């Protein structure tokens, strides 16, 4: 019996008929029990907390059952139903309780029956019209068994389960099988108790040249130091054996006189096991050898066959997934223990002693290929060891296994070569470097004239170098390594010049994601800097109209470029947003001009560190319309302004005039365009360098605009005060205001801007309003005309 949970004695308060229902989908375990099994329910709750949370467990006392609980608590939705079957539950069963249990326990694969004080669950399932549960545990098992059963039910998605429906007439037979299985388990437990704690092999040792002995322990040794004490009638010796594995220890046998010797195994100074061995004189050993030779070595052969069968059975049932590993080299030094050098693996041991069945089983384990080829300190593999010890049949098994492995490897190599050949037919780039040279030139047509020519010159030289480098591929070499190297070199996103000039080194970091070559070239050479400086890209763009790749936009391309033009059109259907950074006059690109001009074409850091691309831009730039020269516009505006000055004071300006003043033509001429652009560029540079956030830059630019507009309003106010002062001092001149208007508006740009500010400024109370001035001095604009 398992001990009851600590602190859960009989004096504990009675819990509720059922615990709180787990919230949401955390419904893993429901335990159904009667009052006499309450302690077991509480104990199992503590055990199952290692697997599930406390909220996922529901304790349901059956004496307070109700059919409404099936819907309110959703009892049938739990993954695992654990029924604690006790005598009280069987005694108090009623038809309603049976019906209630049938609805909860309808799925046998999710039901676990815990036998608590009863021998079998047959009596319960005879009263219920459902199949017997698949899982049945008892109170005599360990907590690990309970956890493993619960895990197999809750996490059943990872395994295949099937439902077994046992007919009524076969339940007796099934219960008999369960009882037989229990008897077998009891017998195995009893036989385990009869196994001695330690066994020394061989049990009989010759007095002269005793050789090695092996000490086999039933249980693993947890302590740090293990000592073996040999005691005879007149001699006692204690020594430390060598570790073979967790349960087997090896040492050289000590020389004792003929007779019995007691062996005590100490672990950290405490006796763990006791056994006895026997020493016999040399004459008796010779008699035994002659007797074995006369009987045809039947005794030795029978013992070897029995050992072979026992070891094979142990490996098949106890260690089904054995894997060859050099564990002994990690535990002990090979220089100190020579048997590791002679028999490095169990396969060598089976070859030496002729354990045929064990060798066949080991050859099916993981790592058997290298274990069969591994040589000991004498340079012998398992096949040679079996031949040296006269095991011809075992030697043939090893040789057949080696031949089979060679055939499998050859088939894999042939399949690999066929895959490479079929792969190379679909990708001609692996065999024709000149094809990549043509595609490189196609990608490079969108670059500017000067650098495109330089790249073509370098590409030809590097292309010839690539042809000489990969010439074995053209001759017909089938080397898979060269082919994969060639594929790696010609990734479209990689830089072909860098790949051809610098060999691929294993110490280099992995390459970035592939990108089109043309896009990389265009992004790494922006043509913009700050205003007021000469940019090389602008000069190159002016020369670029003579290049065939640019001339195709205007329709003047030669006939030899038609095929390339068609290919470019297909490529332009899926253009990268970065492609047009070189032909658009955008402030976004002007920010990174100084950084980008210093970088070379082969550099990758500029592309990686560049911020996200803006909105995709149009594929072509419409030609700019012919505009009137600036000086002509100024004189035209002067003329138009003189004609409209006569109607200044007749009324407020019309909406059409306001619209004309705020038209795009005047907005481009409105002041401080260059200053605003410079201020915006400086702020954007600070944002890109991380010195300022985007919100701070926007706020600063707004303050700058407000400061600019404030200065202009102050100038307008001063100008208006000057006009009023002049008009107030010289009231006799009626046309003085018109003259001042002409004098203070020399250009259309300033006129439009100042008038706009003039009509929008609110006059203060200190100065007289304009209608009062006209009324006071008695002049009107219509008198002159």
From Swiss-Prot:
Give the compositionally biased regions (Acidic residues): 569-578
| Tissues expressing this chain | Expressed in B-cell but not T-cell or myeloid cell lines. Highest expression in CD19(+) B-cells, with very low expression in other cell populations.
Q: Give the GO molecular function terms.
A: phospholipase binding; protease binding; protein tyrosine kinase binding; signaling adaptor activity; signaling receptor binding
- Which Pfam family, giving just one, matches this sequence? DBB
Residue stretches of biased makeup (Pro residues): 611-621
Q: Which SUPFAM superfamilies match?
A: Ankyrin repeat
Q: Check the UniProt entry and state the signal peptide residues, or none.
A: none
User: Keywords on this record?
Assistant: ANK repeat, B-cell activation, Phosphoprotein, Repeat, Systemic lupus erythematosus
Tell me how the protein is altered or processed after translation. Phosphorylated on tyrosines upon BCR activation.
Q: What does this protein do?
A: Involved in B-cell receptor (BCR)-induced Ca(2+) mobilization from intracellular stores. Promotes Lyn-mediated phosphorylation of IP3 receptors 1 and 2.
Disease per record is: Systemic lupus erythematosus: A chronic, relapsing, inflammatory, and often febrile multisystemic disorder of connective tissue, characterized principally by involvement of the skin, joints, kidneys and serosal membranes. It is of unknown etiology, but is thought to represent a failure of the regulatory mechanisms of the autoimmune system. The disease is marked by a wide range of system dysfunctions, an elevated erythrocyte sedimentation rate, and the formation of LE cells in the blood or bone marrow.
Q: How does it assemble?
A: Interacts with LYN, ITPR1 and ITPR2.
Question: What protein does this entry describe?
Answer: B-cell scaffold protein with ankyrin repeats
